[in-house]
Amino acid sequence: MNRFFLSLFLGGALLCAAAGQASASFRVHLQDGSSHVIAPAKVEQSPAQAVVQRALSTLGTPYRWGGSSRERGFDCSGLVNYAFKKVDDLDLPRTSRALSRVDGPKVAKGQLEPGDLLFFRIRGRSVDHVAIYLGNGRFIHAPSRGNTVRIDKLSNSYWSKRFQLARRVMPEGTQLAANG
């Protein structure tokens, strides 16, 4: 019976911890006089999830050419650099064209995963726009002057016509930076 209540209590404590409701460990006293210390579970976040979450935190931030902060605004590559800032061992270049040439496999549209970079050709003959894939055919980007960081669909005819390639810049085993 005590094990049942302990299991029930532990399960509830873990759920609360995973939901962010518990922040400190606590002691459980059982009827038989024994006690157990329960520490909240830490839910680990993958680097790709961290990139997506950090990018989503910028939604609505104004576009600014050369911008790379929430306070001053973002251009497309500034947003990518901001979102990837906490990923260990990634030193990304600052322009969309240079980002399109970084190490990492090209990814087919049907194989996209959250955190993959999407590259577009808006004007001219080479890549000049970059975005972060979110999943379910959606991506986040800083589109252009007069706009804000927003989410668009890759299936939108404007974007699908201009899509050039996708690249996975976080190889398996990539970690979050120690301070991140």
Annotated model-derived regions:
Residues 2-5, 23-43, 47, 106, ...:
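Aromatic- and glycine-rich peptidoglycan recognition patches
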Residues 7-17:
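Bacterial N-terminal signal peptides
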Residues 39-42, 61-114:
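Catalytic cysteine-centered active-site loop
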Residues 47-51, 55, 76, 80, ...:
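Stable alpha-helical elements in mature extracytoplasmic
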Residues 49-50, 55-67:
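Short, contiguous, helix-prone interaction/anchoring segments in small proteins
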Residues 115-117, 137:
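Structural motif
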